[in-house]
């Protein structure tokens, strides 16, 4: 088994599956759906093999594959995973089959839907799903293929150990997501939201491209030019690149700008609420729980390890923006009347926690952030999909149109309650441990930032309990009598998510055992260590730290 290129298999299986599904005859819609399921489950099986064979205590990067790609520019086809990448690979491959099941009818004509399917017709089928003669075209094929293509590109972004290779797939995933939002979205503003998503992220990508080229120029000036991530990190640590510190700060900002848009970090978040609301629930989860994690992953791997000194310099500013995002997302969520928009703003708050944990540069903060990426993916998937199932039955996103749902759909209401409590980090559910670690790590470095972060916990309880009370409790509102409970297909989606939230809430040790060695390697690479616990704060000696921080905002 050691001779099998598992990482190449991992990303090529969904990509090949996407191509084959597009080539299926137009009328074979059911075959396209089932083929997508088979491909996604096969990809999950490969990821389980990778996770099972991964040894956290061994070398930092495992399953390494290295082949020449563009030798003239020092670019190679280099793959490998550390513990952080393994966790994100598992998150991606677990969610994709569930999202395909959840979106089983997302590309289906409205006349084919019925209450028994768990989705009520809300609007006529878009013209693009029909030919001029009324015969169905490849709408289902495209939907499944685009989802698998995004899975492939996200996986490649996580396992790439070449900066140029990472960049290519980091940008390429925007195209299938654009078509999923604009081509299959359910809102009237889906086209505008898709364009907004694409323009924001493309602009960030262009800035990052300049930084990628600049990084290569630096390596070529002081050494043999390369895009190999590990070689560049080793060169930075050894001081082989003697460029002006201002150059490295500019390169850091180029990478950070693209990742801040993708993640998203306040105030670069404005594309997210519209894109999430106008998409189908499954596409919104694919975007927020899977694709956007590449942004926070990029901060943890590329920003910190390629540019340790600039990361330390800009640390106070980034942590400040992250905490502002935490509070901003929570406050704006409280004022929403649209259920899906409210949930979308909660993700902005959660991403603020993740980014703060990364940039406080403590072991607890970074372990908590990595675990938070996993837990946020699961909790967001659960709450967004269950809300989507409810909206599909009622045909309205307005919170005011609901009430008494728990009396007509008790299972739906119960699972929504569990996922909502996971979103507010209730003890006993998965996000609690990760949020606790992030706050603990932040407090040891910036106690005031942690104190403001704690206020967001109170605000999150306010907006989620208010949402549950308005939607699920009280008398049954007019028009809600026909709302049915979760059907079998929907339970297949919800049950694993709820189970994982419960299991990881009481026993996160197996995941932390994979994450912690990778975090320790990152801390060693960037020359950081946890602050010594003390009450007093003596002035550090000159030269005591690796580099100075920038001015505290």
Swiss-Prot record:
<keyword id="KW-0812">Transmembrane</keyword>
<dbReference type="InterPro" id="IPR001750">
    <property type="entry name" value="ND/Mrp_TM"/>
</dbReference>
<feature type="region of interest" description="Disordered">
    <location>
        <begin position="527"/>
        <end position="553"/>
    </location>
</feature>
<keyword id="KW-1133">Transmembrane helix</keyword>
<dbReference type="GO" id="GO:0042773">
    <property type="term" value="P:ATP synthesis coupled electron transport"/>
</dbReference>
<keyword id="KW-1003">Cell membrane</keyword>
<protein>
    <recommendedName>
        <fullName>NADH-quinone oxidoreductase subunit M</fullName>
        <ecNumber>7.1.1.-</ecNumber>
    </recommendedName>
</protein>
<dbReference type="GO" id="GO:0015990">
    <property type="term" value="P:electron transport coupled proton transport"/>
</dbReference>
<dbReference type="InterPro" id="IPR010227">
    <property type="entry name" value="NADH_Q_OxRdtase_chainM/4"/>
</dbReference>
<dbReference type="Pfam" id="PF00361">
    <property type="entry name" value="Proton_antipo_M"/>
</dbReference>
<feature type="transmembrane region" description="Helical">
    <location>
        <begin position="246"/>
        <end position="266"/>
    </location>
</feature>
<dbReference type="GO" id="GO:0009060">
    <property type="term" value="P:aerobic respiration"/>
</dbReference>
<feature type="transmembrane region" description="Helical">
    <location>
        <begin position="140"/>
        <end position="160"/>
    </location>
</feature>
<dbReference type="GO" id="GO:0045271">
    <property type="term" value="C:respiratory chain complex I"/>
</dbReference>
<keyword id="KW-0520">NAD</keyword>
<feature type="transmembrane region" description="Helical">
    <location>
        <begin position="371"/>
        <end position="391"/>
    </location>
</feature>
<comment type="similarity">
    <text>Belongs to the complex I subunit 4 family.</text>
</comment>
<feature type="transmembrane region" description="Helical">
    <location>
        <begin position="4"/>
        <end position="24"/>
    </location>
</feature>
<feature type="transmembrane region" description="Helical">
    <location>
        <begin position="164"/>
        <end position="184"/>
    </location>
</feature>
<dbReference type="GO" id="GO:0048039">
    <property type="term" value="F:ubiquinone binding"/>
</dbReference>
<feature type="transmembrane region" description="Helical">
    <location>
        <begin position="420"/>
        <end position="440"/>
    </location>
</feature>
<comment type="function">
    <text>NDH-1 shuttles electrons from NADH, via FMN and iron-sulfur (Fe-S) centers, to quinones in the respiratory chain. The immediate electron acceptor for the enzyme in this species is believed to be menaquinone. Couples the redox reaction to proton translocation (for every two electrons transferred, four hydrogen ions are translocated across the cytoplasmic membrane), and thus conserves the redox energy in a proton gradient.</text>
</comment>
<feature type="transmembrane region" description="Helical">
    <location>
        <begin position="447"/>
        <end position="467"/>
    </location>
</feature>
<feature type="compositionally biased region" description="Low complexity">
    <location>
        <begin position="531"/>
        <end position="544"/>
    </location>
</feature>
<feature type="transmembrane region" description="Helical">
    <location>
        <begin position="316"/>
        <end position="336"/>
    </location>
</feature>
<dbReference type="GO" id="GO:0008137">
    <property type="term" value="F:NADH dehydrogenase (ubiquinone) activity"/>
</dbReference>
<feature type="region of interest" description="Disordered">
    <location>
        <begin position="113"/>
        <end position="135"/>
    </location>
</feature>
<feature type="transmembrane region" description="Helical">
    <location>
        <begin position="197"/>
        <end position="217"/>
    </location>
</feature>
<keyword id="KW-1278">Translocase</keyword>
<feature type="transmembrane region" description="Helical">
    <location>
        <begin position="34"/>
        <end position="54"/>
    </location>
</feature>
<dbReference type="GO" id="GO:0005886">
    <property type="term" value="C:plasma membrane"/>
</dbReference>
<feature type="transmembrane region" description="Helical">
    <location>
        <begin position="492"/>
        <end position="512"/>
    </location>
</feature>
<feature type="transmembrane region" description="Helical">
    <location>
        <begin position="342"/>
        <end position="362"/>
    </location>
</feature>
<feature type="transmembrane region" description="Helical">
    <location>
        <begin position="84"/>
        <end position="104"/>
    </location>
</feature>
<keyword id="KW-0472">Membrane</keyword>
<keyword id="KW-0874">Quinone</keyword>
<dbReference type="InterPro" id="IPR003918">
    <property type="entry name" value="NADH_UbQ_OxRdtase"/>
</dbReference>
